[in-house]
Every structure is written in C-alpha cells, then in structure tokens.
Amino acid sequence: MKMTFQPKKRQRAKVHGFRQRMKTAGGRKVIAARRLKGRKKLSA
C-alpha cells in the first residue's frame, strides 16, 4: 500500500485556496473566522 497523502500544490490550492474559499458563503465565513482569530495563514 502507498501513503494516502500524495501532495500536489495545484490540487491543494484548487480545493483549499483563498479564491475557492471566497466563492461560497461558508468559505467566506471560514476566512472571516480565521481573520478574527488572528491566523497568519488564512488559507492554503
């Protein structure tokens, strides 16, 4: 068996990236919550 995590920069950004988050209401809430918490990184 292979490892389950096969990292890909493009796929990570497409699924968890900032632009992807901003597309949905829920994603915008995620960004807002992370801003309030003071996260250095808002998204992948």
From Swiss-Prot:
Q: Return the GO cellular component terms, semicolon-separated.
A: ribonucleoprotein complex; ribosome
Ranges of Basic residues compositional bias?
7-22
- Gene3D superfamilies for this protein: 1.10.287.3980
Q: Which domain of life is it from?
A: Bacteria
- Ranges for the region named Disordered are 1-26
Q: Which positions, given as ranges, span the membrane?
A: none
Q: Which residues form a coiled coil?
A: none
Give the record's GO biological process terms.
translation
Q: Name the Pfam families for this protein.
A: Ribosomal_L34 (PF00468)
**Record's keyword terms, sorted:** Ribonucleoprotein, Ribosomal protein
| Single Gene Ontology MF annotation | structural constituent of ribosome
Family according to the record:
Belongs to the bacterial ribosomal protein bL34 family.
Protein known as: Large ribosomal subunit protein bL34
Task: Please report the organism this UniProt entry assigns to the protein.
Answer: Agathobacter rectalis (strain ATCC 33656 / DSM 3377 / JCM 17463 / KCTC 5835 / VPI 0990) (Eubacterium rectale)
Gene responsible for this protein: rpmH
